Amino acid sequence: MKSHKFSSGPAVTGQCLCGSVQFEMEYPAFWAWHDHSRASRLAHGAVYATYVGTWRKRFRITAGDREISRFEEKETGAVRSFCRCCGTPLVYERTRSPYMINIPRALFQSRTGRQPIYHIAIEDMQDWAYAGEPLSPLKGYPGVFCRRSKRKSRV
């Protein structure tokens, strides 16, 4: 953890892929969860997004504020912020929680004080998502794994 102090605790730091935008959040986070919604899937380009949520007053941009681009979802009014240099999703703000801010967990450089134990929009989870099936190394491709094929029983 970085040595900066907020009113009640130390800060954890994070940044976008290119490092243009940097931020800090007071430790610990309020909650963490996996979001399987279509909107988060499209915003992140991934099967789901993992967020850390905290009070807005416990989060601050420390560098690169001018590099942040914002997008408002017309249906929900939610605002998603991205680094305009590298495209990294930075912040997700929901209209029904105006005092809270949600940050992708992967952007933090250390522990946030919360493990993602919640799942939202589970009904939107894709059938092609990895669900913990056993994996085997792919022959000839070091570091690549694949689902084990189910053997058909011979009659």
Predicted stretch roles:
Residues 1-15, 20-155:
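A short Gly-Trp-Pro
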